């Protein structure tokens, strides 16, 4: 019985590169779908794939021209800077949530505190619109049963605006 050619000792990196080149575009597209911590993990995964692919091209293909190598270096550098900015933003928001209290450590960065718990908001990290009417409160178009507090980007929001339509901004 013959052995499998793709399982020999010298081709494990080729399998990794094949998966990397196949699944990195899928992971890049999934950044549109995911948000929060999962998007950060996918972003780090893409950065690692870009770096590994670039190192593979440099190390194993010495005949690669300088244009391809410089393009790979630019892509890895730009994605690395983007990943670093996203990690710093995530850490800043987590630190802000830690300053709000122990119960906020794992909370989403923008959420509404209600009597039922926390309700996540899909909004920008700086503004939210709250419409208060007798019997109901809408936050960015979402019905909130018992509005207690609004947190935007890890900061407690303060109200600015008219009586019924309130624009909340982070302190």
From Swiss-Prot:
UniProt keywords, alphabetically: Membrane, Transmembrane, Transmembrane helix, Viral envelope protein, Virion
InterPro entries in alphabetical order: Arteri_GP5 (IPR001332)
Signal peptide: none
Chief subcellular location: virion
Membrane topology reported for the UniProt record: Multi-pass membrane protein
GO CC terms of this entry: membrane; viral envelope; virion membrane
Subcellular localization: Virion membrane
Chain segments annotated as transmembrane: 11-31, 38-58, 73-93
Keyword Transmembrane helix appears in the UniProt entry: yes
Segments forming a coiled coil: none
The protein's name: Protein X
Species of the source: Lactate dehydrogenase-elevating virus
Upper lineage: Viruses, Riboviria, Orthornavirae, Pisuviricota, Pisoniviricetes
Gene: VPX
């Amino acid at each position: 019985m013959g052995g499998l050619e793709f399982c020999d000792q010298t081709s494990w990196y080729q399998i990794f590169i094949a998966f990397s080149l196949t699944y990195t575009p899928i992971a890049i597209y999934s950044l549109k779908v995911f948000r929060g911590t999962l998007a950060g993990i996918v972003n780090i995964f893409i950065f690692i794939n870009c770096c590994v692919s670039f190192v593979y091209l440099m190390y194993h293909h010495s005949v690669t021209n300088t244009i391809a190598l410089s393009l790979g270096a630019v892509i890895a550098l730009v994605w690395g800077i983007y990943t670093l900015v996203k990690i710093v933003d995530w850490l800043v928001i987590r630190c802000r949530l830690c300053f709000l209290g122990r119960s906020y450590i794992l909370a989403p960065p923008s959420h509404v505190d209600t009597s039922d718990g926390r309700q996540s908001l899909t909004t920008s990290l700086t503004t939210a619109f709250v419409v208060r009417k007798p019997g109901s409160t809408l936050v960015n178009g979402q019905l909130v049963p018992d509005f207690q507090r609004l947190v935007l980007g890890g900061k407690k929001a303060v109200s600015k605006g008219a009586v019924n339509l309130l624009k909340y901004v982070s302190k």
